[in-house]
Amino acid sequence: MLNVTKLIDSIPLNFKKDLEFISKQIHDLGKESFLIGGSVRDLILGKKPHEYDLTTSMLPEEIKKKFKRVIETGIQHGTVTIMLGDNAYEITTYRKDIDYTDGRRPDKIEFGASLSEDMKRRDFTMNAIALDLITERLIDENHGIEDIEKRLIRTIGNPLDRFGEDGLRPIRAIRFQSTLDFTIEPETYNAIYQTRHITEKISRERFHDELNKVLTSNNPFIGLIELHKNKIFELFTKVNFHSNPSDVDLQSLGKLAVAPLGLRLAYLLNWLLPKKDLLIQAEQILKDFRYSKANTKDALFYLDLFLCNYKAEAMNSIETRKFLSKVVAY
């Protein structure tokens, strides 16, 4: 059984003081405040989170009146950010989400929900554990701790419903598989492919952000394999990929602990695309996936290196000099 006091004491001191201050201010008004989401999950895993989100029974306007520096981060969804020194803490009012028709966000939200109702709208059991820093209560109605101990990613309730609400959630499941080295529970996994028509509705910018988190994780190999296997890449570009690429080249990506993003992208594109017109197709994908000009330049440079490695024996002296001058110029 988890020792809640030790869990709270494991929070780095600068964050702990801030979080306890916020929680006490809210509790003194007779309201509720809980630490929730990825920070609680990571604390249970023995990690040191750098971001902390809270949920509360207070309304956004009440929070704005209580705290001196508050930013209206997403006030239409009940979220504001409390600033304490240089630290920022997102705090969201308990809410119920009413209907999802665009596969991206709720059509309507209702405040006045209970903590229990609020947790039911969240994505995965491991992210729906609430920690009260004042009373040292740990609320886990969806068996998230058990799933964390089993290293399982499982949706709250029916995965088709959860993924149907927000098309980013299937990609987040794959991302967590890479970043946490967890396994996706079978029913949840099967729903990833079944809800591709919902995932297709999310913006390319949101996909870009999740792909970056996979690429820069400790184990990008498994996440990239799953994105390809579930045909997620194809939802955001019309470029044709290898139908069955070899995994050998991609496996080495996981060994590049400090590789820059451009090199990681080059490994991905070199794996996904046939060698014919590789650079042209790669540039189009990077544009479709909303990568910056700098990221694109880096990735294409590394891809050019890969191509020259493939055809090195066939290069004549003029081609070799051209390539070397390109490397020097870069």
Tell me what each language-model feature is.
Residues 1-330:
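Catalytic cores of the polymerase beta-like nucleotidyltransferase superfamily
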